C-alpha cells in the first residue's frame, strides 16, 4: 500500500511530509524541504511534495499538457526584479519541467513509479487464489455501463537524471485555493464534473483527455493529498456504483414511478 511505498524515506523525511491528520501526505511540506530549481533565471523554490506531484502529473500526455498550461506555474517561473515586477517571459515549459524532474532522487523516482503502479492496479479485476472475483476493476465496470471495454490512459515515459520512469495515470485535480474559478466549482475534481461524477471513469483515455482540455490553465493541486482522495473515491466507486445505477434505473422506470405515485 501507500505506507509501504513511502517507507523508503527515513524518519526525518517522513516527519517533514507529515501534518496533523494526514499521515505523510499534506498540502504543504514544512521545515526546510524547499529547494531552488537549478538552471533557470527565476528564483523558484519547490517543496519535496511539489516536486513529487509535478513528476506524478508528468506520467501521461494529458496531465503533462495540463501541467505545462498551468497559469500559476507560468507566473511562478517568470523572472522578477526586487520589487516583484516581471523582467522577462515565463521560463515555465519543457526545459523548466525537465529541470524539476532532474531534482528527483533515486528514492523519489522509485516512489513515483510505485504510485503509478498502485493507481494502475485499480484498472483490472482482482481475483483470489481460487479464481473467485474479489473486486471488479474499472475496465469491466465501465464495460458494464457502455458495453465496451474502454482504453485506459496511456503512460508517457519520461526521464529524471537520465533514468527512465515509465509513467502512468495520476488523478488530475485543480487547486481551489489558487483559483476563484476552481473555488466556485466547489473544490470538485474537474474530471468528475465532466464524466458524470464517477471517479473511476477519469482513468479512461477519453475522459482524462476531456479533463485536460477543460483545464483552461487552471492551477493544478501539487499535493499528495490528491492521491489519498483518489483512492477513497475510486474504492467507493468500485464498491457502490453498480448498486446506485441499478437503484436509479428502478426508480426512474415508468411503471415503478406510476406505482409510487398511485400508492
Spans of model-derived segments:
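Structural preference for well-ordered, secondary-structure-rich domains
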Residues: 1-263
Amino acid at each position: 500500500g501507500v505506507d509501504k511505498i513511502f517507507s523508503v524515506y527515513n524518519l526525518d523525511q517522513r516527519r517533514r511530509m507529515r501534518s496533523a491528520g494526514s499521515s505523510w501526505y499534506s498540502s504543504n511540506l514544512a521545515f526546510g524541504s524547499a529547494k531552488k530549481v537549478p538552471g533557470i533565471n527565476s528564483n523558484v523554490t519547490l517543496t519535496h511534495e511539489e516536486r513529487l506531484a509535478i513528476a506524478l502529473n508528468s506520467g501521461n500526455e494529458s496531465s503533462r499538457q495540463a501541467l505545462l498550461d498551468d497559469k500559476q506555474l507560468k507566473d511562478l517561473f517568470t523572472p522578477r526584479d526586487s520589487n516583484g515586477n516581471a523582467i522577462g517571459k515565463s521560463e515555465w515549459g519543457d526545459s523548466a519541467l525537465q529541470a524539476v524532474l532532474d531534482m528527483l532522487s533515486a528514492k523519489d523516482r522509485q516512489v513515483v513509479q510505485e504510485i503509478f503502479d498502485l493507481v494502475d492496479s485499480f484498472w483490472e479485476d482482482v481475483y483470489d487464489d481460487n479464481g473467485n472475483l474479489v473486486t471488479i476493476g474499472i475496465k469491466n465496470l465501465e464495460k458494464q455501463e457502455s458495453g465496451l471495454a474502454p482504453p485506459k490512459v496511456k503512460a508517457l515515459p519520461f526521464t529524471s537524471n537520465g533514468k527512465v520512469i515509465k509513467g502512468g495515470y495520476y488523478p488530475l485535480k485543480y487547486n481551489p485555493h489558487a483559483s476563484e474559478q476552481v473555488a466556485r466549482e466547489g473544490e470538485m475534481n474537474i474530471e468528475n464534473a465532466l464524466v458524470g461524477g464517477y471517479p473511476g471513469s477519469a482513468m479512461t483515455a477519453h475522459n482524462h483527455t476531456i479533463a485536460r482540455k477543460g483545464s483552461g490553465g487552471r492551477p493544478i493541486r501539487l499535493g499528495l493529498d490528491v492521491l489519498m482522495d483518489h483512492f477513497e473515491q475510486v474504492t467507493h466507486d468500485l464498491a457502490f456504483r453498480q448498486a446506485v445505477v441499478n437503484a436509479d434505473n428502478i426508480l426512474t422506470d415508468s411503471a415503478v414511478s406510476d406505482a409510487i405515485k398511485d400508492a
